[in-house]
Amino acid sequence: MPKTIKKQNPSNTTLQYKKYLEQSKEKTAKAKNKDVSIDDLLKKPFLEEIKTNVLKKNKTTRASTATRGTSKVKKQIVESSIDFFDEKKRGVFIVPPAGTSVINDDRDDNKAVEETVSKTAISQNQLAHYANSELVETEQFELKPVALEHNQVLTSTRHSQERESIFEKAQLFWQIFVGDVRFGFWKNHTWIWLGFFDQHQNWYYFEVVETVELPQEHTAFIKRKQIDSCFWKPLVGNPNYGYIQNNIWVWKGFFDTKLNWIPDPVRFTLPMVEKATTTTPVVQIELPAPPTVTVVDQTSPPTAAVTVSTSQPVIEEQTTVFNQTTQLEQLSVSAPLLDQSEVETEMVEVPFVAPSTTTTQPQVVTVQAQPASSSIQFQEPIIKVEFVNESFDFKKPSQTAAAASQAPSQAINIALNEADLIDELVAVGTTATTALPQSELIQEVVVIDNGQPQQAGFHYVVDFLTSTAPLTVAEIELQEQELVNEFVTTTSRETTTFASTPVFEPVVIPTVESEEQLLENEFVESTVVSATSNEPNVASTPVVETVELTETPVSLEPLETVQLETAPVVTETVTVTEKAVEPEVLAVVEEAPLAVEPIVETSTTLAAETVEEAQVEQESTAVAVEPAIETESKATSEAQAELDWEALIGNSEYGYFDAEQNWIWTGYFDEDNKWVSTATAQTEANAEEVVLTADAETSELNTESDPSFEPEVEIQPEPEPNFDLETIPEPESIETTEPEPNFEPEVELEPEIEPNFESETEVQQELAQESSFESEPEPNFETEVEVQPESEIESKFEAEVQSEPKVSLNSDFETKPEAQAEVTPETLEVEATSEAPELQPETEATKVVDDVEEEQLDWELLIGNSNYGHYEPSGEWVWAGYFDDNQIWTPDASVEWARESDYTDLIGDEIYGRYNRKGEWIWYGYYDETGEWVLVDEHYQNHQPRISEAPRFWEQLIGNEDYGYYEDNEWKWYDGEFDSEGNWLVFHSSNAEDAKNIDIAKDIPVFESFDVDSIDADEWLDQFSDSDAKEVFGED
């Protein structure tokens, strides 16, 4: 602890020490001016803002007990997070010394006890009495050592972290109370709180209504129509809205969405803990009557000296426990006052305080304890003090030789929180913790002589403006009206704290890139199933099923004959069981001819897992079968390259557009990208599937083959054409045969009874009567096509039939040739007699394509053809006619008048057209020469055409405030209209209130001398004749 130096040589005094003395003299001179009062000081602008926080603190004094006399206990609640402001507008927090609980936790059962001297106990008269009194010898007193129990010491670092964490949590809850009339009210776009919240989120109402100076600067921004998003920038630096701390602007509140200012109601209250008493005191303390102390104020006249006598009572409810194993020596302390002549040359060493957080050394008193069995008696030392220039200089406490010889000295740390004048007994209980010092100057004299480690305690200075220099207690301006010019010089311990600047680094979210396989020409599924083997071909009997149709028969067209041979890809299995045919089932049935429905023959897919399942031996050759086509695997060239089928959209050979402008394919591409037409007659939805199996035994047609088995077949439905060329396996060979469309075969068939085949799959057949019909089949299934080339087909009817329809096993399309057949149970042989007509198959796909070309024309191919239109100089194509409902071109010169500038605005209007799947705009009609809409598409004949509008000259006036205004980003016209000549006419209101505001005298000067309200218009108009009206208004 730095020692007090008396009469130090001024030449050795540091510059900082001199500056400190000059500041002390200046403040002393200001305080001695009786004309300057605290009310005058509070008239300063910066103090007016904190007037209520400094002077109107809630103070309560508890009544003293009978044994305590004039001792008082203060219980105060600091209502502001700032203890006080200095003359430099800097807010100062006073932090309690170590051992004092920072937060008053209600859950803590142990209450801290504080016994201190009231700052009002030493009045001005007492100080004067002390100044004029002489040194009074201190009386000896005895102490009994007892055990002391101290609370845990809190470090400054822990305290600062706890305070910051409390502040961050405290400002999250109070925003929900904004607008609640129980907590405040609105005034001039500012929320006024009726109280405050402490750090524990407890609400306290103000006991005295505070005269809060409301900030008014932000109200000017609210009255503006268009508010700038950076309106708050001019408010930075305004003390009504915040303060600067460490060169950072800190707001005292926030603005809501309506720009209302809402201040922060959180205040860190530091309550003085209540005194705890014990029902059974451990030690009884008896003290003699205290001596009389006289103090004379040297700054006052001699007549102002007053003698005051005070007595110190015995505190029975307090208990002091000391270590009984240690005996303290008796101590005699004297501190003589300085002479008046030594005032000017007085030099007191003050330790240098760095600009950081400092700690305050609490009072430590060294006393002597004597053993006693029942009680401990304390006797207070009397100190003679001379108050000079607000600074004190004490002699080092002296100890008598007699007291030192009695017992070894022992220092006891009482752990007081303030530097107090020892003018009364301070008794500390077992849970001795002190409360926070108040935000006033301390008026007591301290005698400190202790070699024990100092306890933690510091002043924490918050700089709200620009200065960062720390303050000591001696630099604080007068805070209470009863205070004069005294201040306390105490030892201090420097503690330096550094606040680390947080470094924010951007958080990078790792991204994982995954490759996605691009699928081009994706197929839904592959419907091609084949089973090839090197084993000999298996002969099978055809199974024909008749289906009744309600539609009119349509003639068939010749079909393509395609042969392809694929690799052994087996995805589905068919079990074929060889069974003998029962001859009694094959009876000839002769019935009356009936109307024969078209026979629908469908292709099937025959797949076998193994070659053994597909091999069937013939047990009977007596039954004749329908001519079968030999299917033989042959090597072909390698697979062709992938086909860009999207380029074929629009080609009439591959499909057509329907009424909805959707492209419809008339076939599909096989494994080798060969086009296969599947245009067949569309049947009823309930038409049953027909299984057709054929077996080629030799290269020639066999008419005598015994149906010895009926294989179990599985029919696959035909999906939508979806060409995924990657999923189709490459065939081993392919051979195609072009159909001959010039033949229309007519086959005579006899009714046939279905043979009874014993197998897992039983196919029922219907008898077909002899009839002639035509049908137009539709594709129903997609299966693998495997046919023989035309060059290898030989028929015994070659002389009579020039060509025959070619049927393949596992065909990918349905073969439905127009037939007139005679079927018998015994034989399916085609009769080659003169009665049998020639087989003339038609190419059905070619006919369908022709129909598609008639139904849908690719008019885009006609653009540029001078027979259909011409190009404008601007490069626009203008049609010279239109296509009617039957897609027939109708030349019409009247459509040439339409230009792009006339119908561009109509593109996108569903009344005049639509977009197809390609994104092209399709018109429903056209405008004729008269400008009227002519509807062409009958499907949209119910749509009403748009009425042609006048030139939109008024669009240029949108945005002109003379004609309207914007409301919610929507332009609204004033109450008016344009006449036929384009003049703007405003409608005036006919309300009586508006009529009263009209000054008729301005429009009609004749009425200037008349009372307009009393004039009868009819009576006034009667004085004019018709000729007068014509002269004024004209003949009309």
From Swiss-Prot:
It comes from the Bacteria. Disruption phenotype: Has impaired gliding motility, glides at a slower speed and with longer resting periods than wild-type. Binds equally well to erythrocytes and a human lung adenocarcinoma cell line, but colonizes mucin-producing cells less well than wild-type cells. Residues 718-781 are annotated as: 3 X 6 AA repeats of E-P-E-P-N-F. It is found in: Cell projection, Attachment organelle. GO terms for cellular component: attachment organelle; cell projection. Sequence repeats lie at residues 718-723, 738-743, 776-781. Pfam families: EAGR_box (PF16713). Residues 707-727, 773-784 have a biased composition (Acidic residues). The keyword Repeat applies. InterPro entries: EAGR_box, EAGR_sf. Residues 697-727, 757-784, 798-845 are annotated as: Disordered. Protein cytoskeleton-associated which plays a role in gliding motility and perhaps also in mucociliary clearance. NCBIfam families: EAGR_box. This is Protein P200. The gene is p200.
